[in-house]
């Protein structure tokens, strides 16, 4: 019985260890799902991790690991995500090395670096991924995605950030021993410090500082009483946004 060759994602710097594509995808999926759970998108995060590097199943990428020419390995996953209607995921996958692409337009060609262009691009065959990676059920469309374009864009950027971190950390864990990182202060501790710092602004002097104080108060009230979600802040330069 023919046994398929193991497809590799990484080789250690000393050449003594390898990480298969399947192991990397699954490891990244776990981390990305955990990160995205913070904004109720764990399923989407899992999909991102499982699809982001399926282009590494191509023979051309395997040759790249042995010193061959560079090959685009991110477009494949973006195209699969788009076929399932997961456009925010497609953007995140397409840009997880080079940054989020512009959307572009339907007239864009496969030579364009836009999202429309990437979706038309021919990629190296990577069929073995379906034998090793099983996608869970299609993630539901989050309620927040029905609100407005700003929310959709912010949500896409959050997913992108989760994927970039998860991909980097899983690769780092393979390449070297996991690095101990301090957890830092809790959000409650940071909020306490912020409140202590801004307490001196409770009696602002002058019209500008009064306006700044009013803006801060509006933001604080929204955070305490508003429903969970994504908010935008439109304030002119000098208004104290930071």
List the predicted regions and their residue ranges.
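Flexible, low-complexity segments enriched in proline/glycine/serine and punctuated by aromatic residues
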Residues: 189-217
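Walker A/P-loop
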Residues: 226-242
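Hydrophobic alpha-helical scaffolding
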Residues: 149, 205, 235-238
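Basic side chains
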Residues: 56, 211-212, 241
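Accessory nucleic-acid engagement/destabilization modules that flank
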Residues: 1-200
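N-terminal pre-P-loop "Q-motif" helix
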Residues: 21-27, 206-229
């Amino acid at each position: 019985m023919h046994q398929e060759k193991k497809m590799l994602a990484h080789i250690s710097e000393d050449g003594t260890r390898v990480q298969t594509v399947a192991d990397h995808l699954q490891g990244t999926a776990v981390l990305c799902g955990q990160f995205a759970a913070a904004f109720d998108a764990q399923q989407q995060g899992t999909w991102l991790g499982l699809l982001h590097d399926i282009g590494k199943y191509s023979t051309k990428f395997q040759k790249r690991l042995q010193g061959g020419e560079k090959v685009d390995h991110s477009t494949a996953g973006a195209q699969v995500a788009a076929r399932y209607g997961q456009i925010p995921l497609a953007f995140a996958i397409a840009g997880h090395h080079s940054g989020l692409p512009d959307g572009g337009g339907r007239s864009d060609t496969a030579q364009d670096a836009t999202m429309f262009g990437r979706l038309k691009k021919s990629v190296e065959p990577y069929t073995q991924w379906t034998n090793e990676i099983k996608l869970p059920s299609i993630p539901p469309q989050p309620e927040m995605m029905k609100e407005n374009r700003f929310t959709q864009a912010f949500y896409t950027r959050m997913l992108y950030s989760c994927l970039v971190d998860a991909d980097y950390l899983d690769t780092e864990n393979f390449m070297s021993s996991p690095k101990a990182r301090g957890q830092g202060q809790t959000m409650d501790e940071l909020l306490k410090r912020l409140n202590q710092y801004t307490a001196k602004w409770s009696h602002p002097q002058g019209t500008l500082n009064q306006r700044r104080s009013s803006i801060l108060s509006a933001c604080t009230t929204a955070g305490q009483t508003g429903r969970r979600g994504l908010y935008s802040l439109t304030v002119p330069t000098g208004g104290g946004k930071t």
